[in-house]
Amino acid sequence: MRITDFKTDEPLTIYNFSDTHIGAVCFAEKKLKEHIEMCREEGAYWTHNGDWLEGITPDDRRYMVPDDDKDKTLSTLAQIDHALELFEPLKGKGLASLSGNHEMVLARKIGDVGKRIARRLDTPYLGELGYLNLKVMGQNIPILLWHGAWGGELRGAKANRQHRQSHKFRAKIYLTGHWHTWDPYQDSQHYIKRNKIYKYKRYYISLPSYYDTYANGGNYAQSRAYYDGPIGCCKLTLTDKSIKYELME
C-alpha cells in the first residue's frame, strides 16, 4: 500500500476526478474539459480515482458499440495519448492518482497504464488503493483513495461497502470511485484524550464519473442497466477548521 503526502499553510482546493473513461463513445469530454479548465484557473490541485480510460476495444468481450459508433473507437494507445493531452494543463498539480479495473485489465496486455499516465503528469501513483496524507494550515487530513469494487445495486449496499473501509483504514476522508454515483455522508467517532472526550468526524464520498451511460444507442453499461449517476467531479475545500465538498456538474 502506497502513501504520499502534501503540506500547505494556505487553504487547499482539490478537484477529485474519477472514472473519466476516456475513449468511450459516451465519454463526456466537453464537461471534463470545462472542469479541467476551472481547476487550472483556480490554481487548484487534483486527484484521480482510476478508470482513466475506457480501454474496451473490439477484441474485448465487453465491447458493445452500435455500428454507427464503431469508427469513434480509439485504440488503447490513442486513449492514453488523449488522456495525457486533456490533463496536460494540470501537469505537476496532481496530488495522487489511482488505477481502476479498466486499467488493470489493460495491464495484462500492455503493462501498468495507470502508472504510465501518472508519471507523465508528474503525479504520485498509488495503485488501486492508497493514502494521501495532507496537512492543511496545521490540520491533519488523511485521505483514503480507493477505486472501488462491486458493492451491490442500491445506495445502502454501496454505503456499507464504503463504510467497511473505515474498519480497516483510519482516515478523515474516504474517496471511492467505480460506482459513478454521488452519495456523500458523514459519521463520527468519539475518543478520550487527557480525560476529555473528542469527536473525530469522517467524510465518505462516492465520486461521480464522466461516463454518460445512456447518451448513445448502446454500450456495456446499458446492457447491465447500470445506475445513471451525475456527470462531473467532487471539489474539496480544506482549511485549518473545515472540510467542505461539493458536486461539480
Please tell me what each predicted stretch does.
Residues 2, 11-13, 133, 235-237, ...:
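Ser/Thr- (and often Asn-) enriched beta-sheet segments in non-cytosolic proteins
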Residues 18-24, 136, 147-150, 208:
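Short, flexible loop/turn elements at secondary-structure junctions
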